[in-house]
A protein has these predicted regions:
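C-terminal-of-GTPase-core extension/linker across diverse P-loop GTPases
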Residues: 2-21, 148-270, 287-289, 305, ...
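Generic enzyme active-site microenvironment
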Residues: 278, 312, 341
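Short alpha-helix of the ABC ATPase nucleotide-binding domain corresponding to the H-loop/switch region
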Residues: 284, 292-296, 323
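A glycine-rich (often HGG/GG-containing) alpha/beta subdomain
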Residues: 1-152, 156, 160, 332-333, ...
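Switch I (G2) and immediately adjacent beta-strands of P-loop GTPase domains
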Residues: 59-71, 75-79, 259-287, 305
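Inter-motif core of Ras-like GTPase G domains
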Residues: 292-316
Length: 470
């Protein structure tokens, strides 16, 4: 993807359609820049937009170069710096005809606007101090959010929750390094400005905070992109039937023929405000079929990628099979949530179910156990609740900061390494020069997240991911 020219001046006025491409009831054309009002007024028939108050709406007409009415529109006027971009902004709500949208943008360009590039409105908000870089990235996350949890985190970051925490950490680091460097300036006078015990305590607190943020990425990334759930088990255990039941759709082919699913099938659903990416895999068994063997190999790869594993057990098959399949699955289940799903309970007695539970508990002590009938839709809703609980975010503090961005995660890892080096240096009594350098490095990486310290290449890459009009 072509990167946005981050060095491009903000002197010109830009315009673009901000609503999704296509026909709709209403479309919004956004104009931003010091000549925003001037460019609109050339084609506007209505109240004098130069004289109206900021944050007001006005009904009027847009006329073409021949004076013919193009459309009736509503103009929303936002004067800088109290606007999204920090500049004068006018948003024109017109009818959603593609032709009207194209003609309106063409008129604005003829009036002196330039067509905006992808992400340019948000870039201007960043350059004009309306958003820091992590907030700007959160704008894109809000737009792309596919679940309640992902939306909640993105909105929190867009409103500055993450930024405030990072700012607080950087302020403490700045105070820390100032004391260290003050001592260096007066080293010949043997003056200690900072108690080493107190500095170690501060460094430990900062290390704990940075580590907690970095550790939250595992959950945050899953919330943002969906928790990967692998459905595994022997052929004909009901994996595809369960997937179809969860998706409320016949996505997977269901047959009494063992080995019908020979490859992985993926789809997503939202449960309890969380997105889950379900993966229906080929049945695990010994086979000489080359294609089925390839499917089984992919099954084990998907197990390694999954956060949650649903191990489907055909309750009508011999109990002895459980230990055999468990031996194949367990090596891939370390550190994951494993749920053993005993299926086809509509065909089983209470004694049968008890024996199966006992066999699972022996073969896989760490596995949670659920009993269902996917075909008869018995207790599938309870399994859905088990999935929500397995995601381990139900008890997350709604105000907690959770990292969802890989760039932020990488910066936090580097910041953590730097603060731990400083902590080791303080404990071992090495020169304050080296400790100060590590503290400044930690500050540097935290500053990269918010954009206080960054490069034009990084900024260009980030904003080029936005759609036109945002």
């Amino acid at each position: 993807m072509e990167q946005l020219d981050i060095n491009q001046h903000n002197d010109d006025t830009i315009c673009a359609v901000s609503t999704p491409a296509g026909v709709g009831g209403i479309a919004v054309v956004r104009v931003s820049g010091r000549d925003a009002v001037k460019c609109v007024m050339k084609s506007w028939r209505g109240a004098d937009l130069n004289a109206v108050q900021t944050h007001t709406l006005h009904l009027g007409r847009i006329v073409d170069t021949d004076g013919e009415t193009l459309d009736e529109v509503v103009a929303a006027v936002f004067r800088g710096p109290r606007s999204f971009t920090g500049e004068d902004v006018i948003e024109l709500s017109c009818h959603g005809s593609l032709w009207v949208q194209q003609q309106l943008v063409a008129l604005l360009i003829g009036n002196g606007c330039r067509a905006a590039e992808g992400g340019e409105f948000t870039r201007r908000a960043f350059m004009n101090g309306r958003l820091d870089l992590s907030q700007a990235e959160a704008v894109a996350d809000v737009i792309a959010s596919g679940s309640k949890a992902a939306h909640r985190i993105a909105v929190s970051q867009m409103r500055g929750g993450f930024s405030r925490m990072l700012s607080s950490l950087r302020e403490r680091l700045l105070e820390f390094v100032s004391l260290m460097e003050l001592e260096l300036d007066f080293s010949e006078e043997d003056v200690e400005f900072a108690d080493r015990t107190r500095l170690i305590a501060i460094a430990e607190e900062i290390n704990t905070a940075v580590t907690r943020l970095a550790d939250s990425f595992a959950v945050g990334n899953a919330i943002k992109n969906g928790f990967p759930v692998a459905i595994v088990g022997e052929p004909n255990a009901g994996k595809s039937t369960l997937l179809n039941r969860l998706l409320h759709d016949d996505k997977a082919l269901v047959s009494d023929i063992r080995g019908t699913t020979r490859d992985v099938i993926e789809d997503t659903i939202t449960l309890g405000g969380l997105t889950f990416r379900f993966i229906d895999t080929a049945g695990i068994r010994q086979t000489t079929d080359a294609i089925e063997t390839m499917g089984i190999e992919r099954t084990f790869k998907k197990l390694d990628e999954a956060a949650i594993i649903l191990w489907m057990i055909d309750g009508t098959q011999p109990v002895a099979n459980i230990a055999t399949v468990a031996a194949d699955i367990l090596p891939h289940a370390e550190g994951k949530h494993l749920v053993a799903v005993i299926n086809k309970i509509d065909c089983l007695s209470d004694a049968d179910i008890s024996a199966l539970r006992s066999a699972v508990a022996t073969a896989a002590p760490s596995a949670a156990i659920a009993t269902i009938s996917a075909k008869a839709d018995i207790a599938v809703d309870s399994l859905e609740q088990s999935l929500i609980e397995a995601a381990a975010v139900a008890d997350t503090d709604p105000n907690a900061v959770i990292v969802t961005n890989a760039r932020h995660y990488d910066a936090l890892l580097h910041a953590g390494e730097a603060i731990r080096r400083a902590l080791d240096g303080l404990r071992s009594g090495i020169s304050g020069d080296f400790v100060s350098q590590d503290i400044r490095e930690c500050m540097h990486y935290l500053g990269e997240i918010t954009g206080e310290i960054t490069t034009h290449e990084i900024l260009g890459s980030i904003f080029s991911r936005f759609c036109i009009g945002k």
